[in-house]
């Protein structure tokens, strides 16, 4: 009888193990340049303390599972984390490898993922320490995480960066360096690379990322694309661009169901604005002029992916 129970227990465990290994991991992956906190933005009405809760609501509504942020200072990341129950993040400051300067942080839902390993490296000839690489004008950092999808037991790699806005050589070399690091940290694993690359889909460093076949642009491989604008808006709600400077790249073993540029906006009150009434609406309905604003000077991009 005991032998029978043992055999049954082993059979059940084996079956569960097979089921978990066969189960697909379906995830919402995003990239969001949240714009660094600065006085000029506050004067213009785009201050971080106004934008932060709106950013958090957007993230929660669209159900980001894992997302990379760019430009955030430590206090911004802590405020965002406080507004996102059930999320944690990893990533260090680019100036000192601790807290100073902008971060390329990775946020993830703790109910869906377990952080297995993580780290950071600089986009330079000396990636193991804070440094400026090649012809860049600022130190640039890439943070990475190895995450286990709790339901399926599958693991994935996630890289997030912010490339230099001036250095052309730096962007190309950074693209090569990141691909080298991907092989070091878990070749063969489903891999995501998010970030503000400071170049659109027509530039050489973009081509460097997809030319080897190790990465695909999710915009090009998604079954469905919803992208009514580019990804940089400069806080202009009336502007349009075809340039995608924020990207989500995926390894070939990741299937992308859909891709979207989320052009959500919000409104702030205008001084002395008078309510308008329309003959086409009930009399109790008034429309009050407000200023349209974007939660950041970049739109977030998000994909639904499976592996």
Segments predicted by a language model, with ranges:
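N-terminal, active-site-proximal structural segment of metallo-dependent hydrolase catalytic domains
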Residues: 5, 21-83, 94-102, 176, ...
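Structured beta-strand-rich core segments of catalytic domains in phosphoester-bond hydrolases
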Residues: 66-155, 159, 258-263
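Metal-dependent phosphoester-hydrolase catalytic domains
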Residues: 169, 182-191, 199-307
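Bacterial Sec-dependent N-terminal signal peptides
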Residues: 1-25
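Active-site neighborhood of phospho(di)ester-bond hydrolases with catalytic His/Asp-centered motifs
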Residues: 68-70, 91-92, 192-196, 217-221
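His/acidic metal-ligating clusters that form di-metal
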Residues: 141-161, 168-209
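Short, solvent-exposed loop/turn elements at domain surfaces
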Residues: 36-45, 116, 168, 226-229
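Active-site metal-binding loops of divalent metal-dependent hydrolases
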Residues: 32-34, 161-163, 196-197, 299
């Amino acid at each position: 009888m005991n032998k029978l129970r043992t055999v049954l227990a082993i059979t059940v465990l084996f079956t569960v193990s097979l089921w978990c290994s066969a189960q697909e991991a379906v995830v919402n992956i995003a990239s969001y340049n949240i714009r660094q906190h600065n006085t000029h933005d506050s004067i213009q009405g785009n201050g971080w303390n106004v934008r932060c809760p709106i950013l958090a609501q957007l993230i929660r509504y669209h159900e980001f599972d894992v997302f990379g942020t760019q430009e955030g200072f430590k206090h911004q990341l802590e405020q965002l984390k406080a507004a996102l129950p059930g999320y944690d993040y990893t990533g260090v400051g680019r100036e000192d490898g601790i807290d100073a300067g902008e971060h390329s942080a990775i946020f993830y839902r703790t109910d869906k993922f377990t952080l297995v390993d993580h780290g950071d490296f600089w986009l330079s000839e000396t990636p193991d320490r804070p440094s400026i690489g090649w012809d860049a004008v600022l130190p640039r950092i890439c943070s990475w995480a190895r995450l286990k999808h709790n339901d399926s037991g599958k693991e994935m790699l996630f890289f997030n960066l912010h490339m230099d806005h001036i250095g052309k050589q730096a962007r190309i070399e950074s693209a090569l360096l990141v691909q080298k690091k991907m092989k070091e940290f878990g070749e063969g694993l489903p891999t995501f690379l998010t970030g503000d690359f400071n170049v659109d889909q027509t530039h050489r460093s973009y081509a460097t990322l997809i030319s080897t076949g190790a990465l695909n642009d999710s915009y090009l491989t998604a079954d469905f694309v919803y992208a009514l604008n580019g990804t940089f808006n400069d806080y202009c709600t009336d502007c349009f661009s075809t340039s995608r400077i924020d990207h989500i790249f995926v390894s070939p073993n990741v299937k992308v169901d859909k891709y979207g540029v989320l052009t959500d906006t919000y409104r702030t009150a205008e001084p002395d604005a008078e309510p308008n009434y329309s003959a086409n609406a009930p009399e109790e309905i008034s429309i009050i002029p407000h200023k349209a604003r974007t939660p950041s000077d970049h739109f977030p991009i998000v994909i639904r992916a499976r592996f």
